[in-house]
Amino acid sequence: MFKNVLFPVDQSREAREAAEVVVNIVQQYGSHLVLLSVVEVPAPGEEPPQASPMTSPEAIAELLKTAQTLFTERGVQAQTLEREGKPAFVICDVADEIDADLIVMGCRGLGLTEEGASESVTTRVINLSPCPVLVVP
């Protein structure tokens, strides 16, 4: 059912909590797991993100290594990908590239305001994704 599962990772608590769900899905369905981390690059004329560790390729590489180790310890093999760009767009592009059957994401809970909902990477992925998205609260 879920042959290819994409799990975008960052340094958030929500991503760590969603990892347990990913392990269960991958083990239950014998899925191929792809871990993705995105180095956020500002658009021309846009301010760079405020001192975010997600803008450093070195920090991203370390994050992916740590995530891969976490899954390996649970008996799950994972492929890692590092990309640059706007997270929501990159996540959807990679899902299309790898023919993902499911994207699993944590949810940060930016609030019920219209602005918070529209700015959420998760919301954008849900709206743009070429496959189902499982949001782990």
Walk through the language-model features, giving the residues of each.
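Small/aliphatic-rich secondary-structure junction motif
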Residues: 3-49
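Gly/Ser-rich helix-loop-strand patches that form or flank binding pockets
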Residues: 24, 93-137
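Short glycine/serine/threonine/alanine-rich loop segments
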Residues: 31-32, 76, 100, 131
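Conserved beta-strand positions in the Rossmann-like core of class I SAM-dependent methyltransferases
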Residues: 34, 79, 134
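Generic structural signal for helix capping and beta-alpha/helix-loop junctions
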Residues: 42-43, 88, 112
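A short acidic, glycine-rich active-site loop
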Residues: 48, 52-62
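Structural beta-alpha unit
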Residues: 69-103
